[in-house]
Design a protein with these regions (language model features):
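N-terminal leader segment of winged-helix/HTH proteins
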Residues: 1-40, 86
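N-terminal helix-turn-helix DNA-binding core of bacterial DNA-binding proteins
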Residues: 27, 31-72, 94, 98-105
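Residue-level signal for well-ordered alpha-helical positions
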Residues: 52, 113-114
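Alpha-helical residues within the helix-turn-helix
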Residues: 67, 78, 84-85
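Recognition helix of helix-turn-helix DNA-binding domains
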Residues: 74-75, 80-81, 98
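Short, Lys/Arg-enriched C-terminal cap helix and immediately downstream tail that follows
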Residues: 87-90, 95-96, 111-113
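A common structural junction motif
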Residues: 118-119
Length: 119
């Protein structure tokens, strides 16, 4: 005969397991954050975002990022463009090179979504 588990008192669970978020996302918040998460859903783009954000000086160009991947420069540029179009990266053209830096506003939106108190 299967053994049943005891039910927990919902009032008592708040002490051991605080909610992950103060309140659910509104429709507008979900629509704002969804494109950011969609852009980050690719492992290459997630890693590119991490590399740019942690790069010395807070910015990097394709020439700085190519050695970290077994991908062609045009492919890396495409992924950087997707991140830029989603608002995760800002860019600045200097001569023939385009330098990318993480958008602090987009990162703050993501941090608020996951409840990171540092941002």
């Amino acid at each position: 005969m299967p053994k049943s588990l005891p039910l927990l008192d919902p009032a008592g669970t708040a002490a051991c397991c605080p909610p992950l978020s103060a309140e659910p996302l509104s429709q507008a918040q979900a629509e704002q954050v969804a494109p950011l998460l969609k852009a980050l859903a690719d492992p290459v783009r997630l890693r590119l975002m991490s590399l740019v954000a942690s790069h010395p000086g807070g910015e990097a160009c394709v020439c700085d990022l190519g050695d970290a991947f077994d991908l062609t420069q045009p492919t890396i540029s495409h992924h950087l463009k997707v991140l830029h179009e989603a608002g995760l990266l800002e860019r600045d053209k200097r001569g023939v090179w385009v330098y990318y830096r993480a958008s602090t506003q987009a990162l703050a939106s993501l941090a608020a979504l996951i409840g990171d108190p540092r941002l």
